[in-house]
Curated annotation (Swiss-Prot):
(2R)-2-phosphoglycerate binds at Q168, K351, R380, S381, K402. Its EC number is 4.2.1.11. PANTHER family: ENOLASE. Gene3D superfamilies: Enolase-like C-terminal domain, Enolase-like, N-terminal domain. This is Enolase. Belongs to the enolase family. It is found in: Cytoplasm; Secreted; Cell surface. SMART domains: Enolase_C, Enolase_N. Mg(2+) binds at D249, E300, D326.
Length: 440
């Protein structure tokens, strides 16, 4: 099926900042739309998110240049092309930019087009998006699919909230569930119990960027204790063994300065932490000790993006924890290969806008899976209502998904899309935590 037209335009993300939307028009008056997310805590290895820098528009945040690049440079090369030739078209995008970090056209321009080509291909193939991704892009024809285990961000801190918590995300992971819908039920009940506990203790129930609560607390322990209380109050068992466990995104690159790890918010708010500055070895011990006191099964970016030795030593000493690389890898095959050589982590966070195209994202996922590295499909803190990553997580067999809390519709939309897919696939969609958490 031929591409008839392509149009990029500016929309807003969940923070009210401009982002790129792309609409693809196919034969027979069919069309699809993609919207590009944006991060707050970004790794230095990420592909360039092109913004205008014009102070007269959206405080320099507008994306008119990226939109012009789609409409004036990319569009003419795609007209009348067969939308089903995904890899050929995606390679065309990469070559049109011609730079390693997408600095010519912008990763936000390229990704919008890349996603919309995938969506258009699914329409042309008359397949659900997740099935098209699995069969036509991953070349996997097994009739069974894996439902992603949700890592739900219930307490927000760091760059995602205006509170005194330095850890960016405090999450719950429902390993107890036997289906995705039961996992969502578990999460919803815990989320609402957490709200009751916060109110009862006169703590703020305002939400952060990703829909989690953003209270002012004494320290990181207090946040974890609140989650454990909420799990118990909702009549679940806080445990790494088929219970409801915890996960963290430390975003350590945001806390690293002068070769030290520093709890910056804790310092500025005079909280009760006994220690606020750590060497790499002390930092590793802090997280190991924390994981021994709470049912923590996964820690993301527990070291700076360039502290390869720190990651490697932590994984060696904590093989029972899922150690996730986000800023460490930035969904870039070159850095993942280095990480595997270093034995740096046993999991990678996948954010398509960090690399800029879906084909390059698929290369990273395939390489990770071939090397027994867990893959977690992730949203960004500046999200849209686009549910692409829900289908993507199922289509590539990622096994896990991070898409925020159980509030804010741009987060809920992804969960609801997976629930919809569950209804379509029924028992062909398998929720199997033990497959993806073998080390717990």
């Amino acid at each position: 099926m031929k591409i008839v037209d392509l149009l990029a335009y500016q929309v807003l993300d969940s923070r009210g900042q401009p982002t790129v939307a792309v609409k693809l028009f196919l034969e027979n008056d069919q069309s699809v739309v993609a919207m590009v997310p944006s991060g707050a805590s970004t790794g230095t290895k990420e592909a360039l998110e092109l913004r205008d820098g014009d102070a007269n528009y959206f405080f320099s945040k507008s994306v008119k240049l990226a939109i012009q690049n789609v409409n004036n440079i990319i569009r003419p090369h795609l007209l009348n092309k067969n939308v089903l030739n995904f890899f050929e078209l995606d390679n065309l995008l990469i070559n049109l930019d011609g730079t390693e970090n997408k600095t010519k056209l912008g990763a936000n321009a390229l990704l919008g087009v890349s996603i919309v080509i995938v969506k258009g291909g699914a329409v042309a193939a008359s397949k659900p998006l997740y099935q098209y991704i699995k069969e036509d892009l991953m070349h996997n024809y097994d009739e069974h699919y894996y439902a992603p285990i949700p890592l739900m961000n219930f307490i927000n801190g760091g760059a995602h909230a205006d509170n005194n918590l330095d850890i960016q995300e405090f999450m719950i992971v429902p390993l107890n569930a036997i289906s995705f819908s039961q996992a969502i039920q578990t999460g919803s009940e815990i989320f609402h119990e957490l709200a009751k506990i916060l109110k009862a203790n006169h703590l703020n129930t305002a939400k952060g960027d990703e829909g989690g609560f953003a209270p002012m607390l004494n320290d990181n322990y207090a946040a974890l204790e609140l989650l454990v209380r909420a799990i118990k109050k909702a009549h679940y068992f806080p445990s790494k063994k088929q219970g409801v466990c915890l996960a963290l995104d430390v975003a350590s690159s945001e806390l690293y300065e002068n070769e030290k790890y520093v709890f910056k918010k804790a310092l500025s708010h005079n909280t009760n932490l006994e220690q606020t500055s750590f060497s790499s070895d002390e930092w590793a011990k802090y997280w190991s000790d924390l994981a021994s006191q709470f049912p923590i099964i996964s820690i993301e970016d527990c070291f700076d993006e360039n502290d390869w030795n720190g990651f490697s030593l932590f994984l060696k000493n904590n093989p029972h924890i899922q150690s996730v690389g986000d800023d460490l890898y930035c969904t870039n095959l070159k850095y993942l290969q280095k990480g595997i050589n270093f034995k740096a982590t046993n999991a990678i966070l996948i954010k398509p806008n960090q690399i800029g195209t879906i084909s390059e994202t698929l290369d990273v996922i395939k390489y990770a899976q071939e090397n027994n590295i867990n893959t977690i499909i992730s949203h960004r803190s500046g999200e849209t209502e686009d549910t692409f990553i829900a289908d993507f997580a199922i289509g590539v067999g990622a096994g896990q998904i991070k898409t925020g809390s159980l509030s804010r519709s741009e987060r809920i939309a992804k969960y609801n899309r997976i629930l919809e897919i569950e209804q379509e696939l029924k028992d062909k969609l398998v929720y199997e935590p033990n497959k993806f958490f073998k080390f717990n």
